[in-house]
Each structure stands twice: as C-alpha cells, then as structure tokens.
Regions:
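Short acidic/glycine-rich loop or secondary-structure boundary segments that cap or lie
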Residues: 137-139, 182-184, 196-199, 223-225
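Glycine-rich phosphate/pyrophosphate-binding beta-alpha loops
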Residues: 189-201
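Catalytic core of DAGKc-family lipid kinases
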Residues: 5-7, 31-39, 74-189
C-alpha cells in the first residue's frame, strides 16, 4: 500500500484547513493510500521517520510550502510533492494550476500526473515562488495573522501603505548570467513563479523554464515609483521598472537589507548568489 504524508498548517489562511483535513484524509484513504497526517510542528523536521513515503501533500500557504521543501532538501530527499492551497495568497499553488478550494485541490491531486518544476535557491535557502527585498517586500512578515484571517489579501495592502515612511534606495552591484551593471533600487523581486500576493507581476514567468524573472524598481521620487509599478501591473513597460531574465544572479550591496522568501523572513545579506535549479521538484 502506498503511503502519503499529509502535512497541514492550521494557522494558514483563515484557519479552515483543519476542518477540511478530515475530508481530505478520507479521500486519500478511499484511493488506497495509507496516510500519516497532522498539523506541522515547525520545531522539527517533518520528514524524520518518513523519508520513504510515496507522496507528500502540503496544505498551507507559500510559507508552509517553503518550510516543507527546505526540510526535504535538508535531508537530500526527492519525494513526490502535492500542494493544496490553504494560505492567504497561494502564489505557488496558482502557478501549478491548483484549484482554490482545498477539497477540490485534493481531488485534483488524486487524478493528476507527475511533473517536474523549477525551484530557486539563494545562498543556502530554497524558494518556490519568490525571493525579494526592498519596499513592500517584507509586508507579509509584518501583517498580523489575525488581520489576514479577517480580511485576507487586503491586510497586505493596509500594512504596505505604512512602509512609505521608511522608503530608501538600495545601491546594488548585479551580475546576471555574466552581465554586470549597477543601479539604486527601491525593490527587487526574483521570481520562480509569476505572482506575489496574488498580483501578476511576472506574467511571462514559468516554473518549467529554468529561468528567473527579475524585476528591479529603480529609485526616483516616490510618486513616480508607485505610478511606474502600477503601469507595469497594467501591462505597460515603464523605464523605471527593469525586467530581465537570468539563470544565476550575484548581488552585492553595502546595505544589510532584510529579505523575504515566499512571504517569510529570511537572512539579511550584503552579498547573495541566487540560481535557478531546473526541474528540481
């Protein structure tokens, strides 16, 4: 009998996944799986004692998926992974084409086919959707879970407005696939997926092409910067938004800037190396 490890984060999204978890578990049992399930204990590696399962199903947001993938890579495992969207934004699940309803997504997994997709890595940390730093990029870290549960994605917007008070330029030296350039940026977004917080910022990105889509918002006055990003969201090509694609990136800055991976707090860097690992998941 095949075995599935079903991991869910009861704090993700509006906390509804705990109610759905019983129905999802029963669906896999009916499909002939032996199931090990339960809420994720973030103080330990969930793969301890479960290194040989046939399938890992993760129900949560991008941060939960990030945690599970990093713990899996920590043990050098290459297990079949299924994603059930249960967070606030669920950007990576969206890139995979998953149903938004968790129970429907579980049915989709049971009837689906195996595919290999890309995974990003920055220094020693993996990310499935986005690595970022600068204005607005740490908003999700500072948005209270209670507010996210109450009003969903709108909570990110409210928290993001507060960042206008602390906006600053970040001097960057960048080497992208061997091409060097310098600029002062307000924000840097390195996409494996195509959305951030549900916003389609890199619509031409693909999780199967072995490439990052990179967006850098160059420093100008704040109003012009906001207008430029809005134009980009609407499909325009403002000169202030530098958009390029690369397999590897070396970025150096004199500022030890806080960073974000898949909506979670990451280490601050003055030098980082990011590379796309094609078909790594």
């Amino acid at each position: 009998m095949k075995q599935v490890l079903f991991l869910y984060n009861p704090q993700s999204g509006k906390g509804k996944i705990e109610k759905d978890s019983q129905a999802i578990g029963e669906m896999f049992r009916q499909a002939g799986y032996s199931i090990v399930d339960g809420p994720i204990d973030f103080s330990r590696n969930p793969f301890n004692g479960h290194e040989t399962v046939d399938l890992v199903v993760v129900a949560g947001g991008d941060g939960t998926v990030n945690y599970v993938v990093n713990r899996m890579k920590e043990k050098h495992l290459d297990l079949l992974l299924g994603i059930i969207p249960a967070g606030t934004a669920n950007d990576f699940a969206g890139a995979l084409g998953m149903e938004k309803n968790p129970v429907k997504a579980a049915a989709q997994l049971l009837g689906g086919t195996e595919e290999r997709v890309d995974c990003g890595r920055v220094n020693d940390h993996y990310f499935v959707n986005i690595f970022s730093f600068g204005i607005f990029t740490t908003t999700s870290q500072r948005t209270p879970d209670k507010r996210k549960h109450q009003i969903g994605k709108l909570a990110y917007l409210i928290e993001g407005v507060k960042e206008f008070r602390s906006v600053h330029g970040i001097p960057l030296q960048i080497l992208a696939d061997g091409k060097a350039f310098d600029l002062e940026s307000l924000m840097a977004l390195i996409f494996n997926g195509e959305t951030a917080g549900g916003f389609h910022l890199a619509p031409r990105s693909s999780i199967k092409d072995g490439m990052f889509d990179c967006l850098l918002l160059q420093r100008r006055n704040m109003l012009f910067s906001v207008v430029s990003m809005l134009r980009h969201l609407l499909g325009g090509r403002p000169s202030q938004v530098k958009h390029f694609r690369a397999r590897t990136l070396d970025i150096t800055s004199p500022i030890n800037e806080p960073t974000d991976v898949d909506g979670q707090k990451a280490v601050s860097y003055t030098h980082l190396r990011a590379h796309e690992t094609k078909a790594n998941l």
